[in-house]
Amino acid sequence: MGGDDLSFTRLVITALFGLLMLLQIKETSASTSFVSSSVCKSDHLTYTKPYQQGSLFTINGNPVEKLRFCEALRFHKANGCIFEDSFSDDFCTIHSLLGRRFLEEKTVKDSKNSKPKTEYSHVKVSIAGSGFLLLCCALCCPCFHKERKANSHEVLPKESNSVHQVSSFEMSPSSEKIPQSPFRAPPSPSRVPQSPSRYAMSPRPSRLGPLNLTMSQINTATGNFADSHQIGEGGFGVVFKGVLDDGQVVAIKRAKKEHFENLRTEFKSEVDLLSKIGHRNLVKLLGYVDKGDERLIITEYVRNGTLRDHLDGARGTKLNFNQRLEIVIDVCHGLTYLHSYAERQIIHRDIKSSNILLTDSMRAKVADFGFARGGPTDSNQTHILTQVKGTVGYLDPEYMKTYHLTAKSDVYSFGILLVEILTGRRPVEAKRLPDERITVRWAFDKYNEGRVFELVDPNARERVDEKILRKMFSLAFQCAAPTKKERPDMEAVGKQLWAIRSSYLRRSME
């Protein structure tokens, strides 16, 4: 087909679509309707009357489907709300229930005090107009899409002595917006949390893209690795905060010179594994240096400190129970991705509170992959035979005895971490009484004695239902079982945590 024929076809399709949209607008404008609304607890419910095909339903100003709207009505009626006779619910076939509160009808007004009966028509006119414009752009401007696609794969040319950057495919920027947790707003049926299969189990690339820096730029960003820029230290090296010329803040991990040769394997492992993963609950690799006597790993900067800092109150605030539950679920999602959804199974081997970083919005990110190993590649292989590495208190006892590394070793560490988050105590506290020095044993004894409230960190600032606490500790003890056969996998742990979260939400609404 020639270019003129193709243009003519697009023009005809556009004209026909526009005509259909105008007819729909005319039909909508000719109908008469008005808005009925009610407020119950935290939800503002509105719909256009009389009910007909295409009526608009909203909860808190957000358009929703009729099914969700009816679920919200059913929820509020079951919890004692009474709606006036003018607020009809015949379309939901809900039977009226006695309740405790009377709801006043509120008129929905826009910023210009327009009449309610015109609001629905205006909404549909706006939607129709937007759809018409979008179709015109899609049909008439294919060159725009091609140009954007071409530009999205550009890679900056490398300079001499520059930082290696990961591939643009693996580290492509994204404008992803992380959904708010249901604990950060009053819960309602219009904000039902997503299922574990859809929530953070798949890769979620960071907004940050790959970097291409020279050593001169890195020295400038860190003040020549000044002590004032130091933000942490681990087995691999010292971590510095770096501020780039464009204002972007990064974390730069510098290998210790005294262990330079011995840590070559850890460096290569961390770079290789980080370059192949992308998940919102894992720290993102931006680049690395392996030249001369310098080995550097550059990652995104997570400025709200470590989980251990917050448990200690070192950041000025203490974590409440809601935040602790959020963090546990985030860490679980990150590990589930590593074990089950990454290109190849990855075993972290060093899950601990100081390797969990928190964002300003208290999202948790798993960091420090220096000890990480790829899991078995053969379906017949059950484990990796390797030297024991990790942190005392979090180490899987079966792994220490047999040198057999599996993903269940991370599960054990997660169980210890869960006890730490709930109690606020470190895994090993040598200054305590003999029967309290090993935190997981002390917690297990208290749990069996039915004294679960004595286990909770007093800084949690909330008295949680005993059943919720028992479920949390029971899950922690399952994960920290002595042998891997007794431990669940991280995906099963995630499902249990989601069930606990649902129970917690229901009780918080009672």
Curated annotation (Swiss-Prot):
ATP binds at residues 231-239, 253. Residues 240-265 are annotated as: CaM-binding. Residues 166-178 have a biased composition (Polar residues). InterPro entries: Kinase-like_dom_sf, Prot_kinase_dom, Protein_kinase_ATP_BS, Ser-Thr/Tyr_kinase_cat_dom, Ser/Thr_kinase_AS. Residues 1-30 form the signal peptide. Gene3D superfamilies: Phosphorylase Kinase, domain 1, Transferase(Phosphotransferase) domain 1. The modification Phosphoserine is found at residue 354. Residues 225-499 form the Protein kinase domain. The modification Phosphotyrosine is found at residue 399. Keywords: ATP-binding, Cytoplasm, Kinase, Nucleotide-binding, Phosphoprotein, Serine/threonine-protein kinase, Signal, Transferase. GO terms for cellular component: cytoplasm. It catalyses: L-seryl-[protein] + ATP = O-phospho-L-seryl-[protein] + ADP + H(+); L-threonyl-[protein] + ATP = O-phospho-L-threonyl-[protein] + ADP + H(+). The keyword Transferase applies. Its EC number is 2.7.11.1. Interacts with calmodulin (CaM) in a Ca(2+)-dependent manner. This is Calmodulin-binding receptor-like cytoplasmic kinase 3. The gene is CRCK3.
